[in-house]
A protein has these predicted regions:
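Active-site metal-binding loops of divalent metal-dependent hydrolases
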Residues: 39, 76-77, 176-178
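Acidic/histidine-rich helix-loop elements
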Residues: 44-53, 146
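C-terminal segment of N-terminal export signals and the immediately downstream linker at the start
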Residues: 1, 18-33, 41
């Protein structure tokens, strides 16, 4: 793979996400891919772990996705009693940190449990050209923020191979939440390249 360029698309964090998107000239090529991270009911208003104004990112991503031939969606997909849930650690509360075999882990409220409406993609997310959904965080004893690799830094999700097989050289990353899953996806991508904010 040659150079890869990463764009962390932080639209929901801004006061006016649509004007931000309009101000950025994103010109994908045939060897570009858009990775849409965790735009799920659990991470928007009314969900179990909501990102403030999370739904504001959806129309921006819908519009952006129409420009790409290659689109991948990720989905947080936890088992009940997942190791990252505070409820799985007696006497612990959500947002406390604990040390686990793979490193420090923030404990979360139960969220994005497999097969529940909370784990579903937001219904207004409309990306019919998406070719792949990567489910992450489904190993009960390992959390996963990155779309590429679980938090143990060993277990891959399959996304790297998918992008290499398609000879993708430019990756744009969008979604929820920029402080965790979007950030980790951007930082942990195993492909060489540059980060553009």
């Amino acid at each position: 793979m040659n150079r890869c360029h990463f764009a962390s698309f932080l639209s929901f964090a801004l006061a006016s996400p649509l004007s931000f998107a309009a101000s950025k000239k994103i010109t994908p090529k045939a060897n570009s891919a858009l990775v849409v991270v965790d735009v799920q009911n659990c991470f928007v208003e009314g969900g179990t772990l909501p990102v403030q104004n999370g739904k504001d990112v959806v129309p921006v991503i819908n519009r952006l996705a129409t420009q790409f031939d290659n689109v991948v969606i990720t989905q947080d997909w936890h088992t009940p009693a997942h190791i990252s849930f505070a409820s799985s650690h007696q006497g612990r509360k959500a947002f406390e940190a604990v040390q686990l075999s793979y490193g420090q882990q923030v404990l979360w409220p139960d969220h994005c449990i497999q097969g529940t409406p909370d784990a579903d993609l937001v219904s207004s997310l409309h990306i019919p050209n998406a070719e792949l959904i990567i489910r992450k965080g489904y190993h009960q004893s390992i959390d996963s923020y990155s779309a590429f690799r679980e938090a143990d830094h060993k277990t891959g999700t399959g996304l790297t191979g998918y992008l290499r097989e398609r000879q993708i050289q430019q990756v744009f990353i969008s979604g929820l939440a920029t402080d965790f899953c979007v950030a980790w996806t951007t930082k942990k991508c195993p492909l060489k390249g540059h980060l553009y904010n």
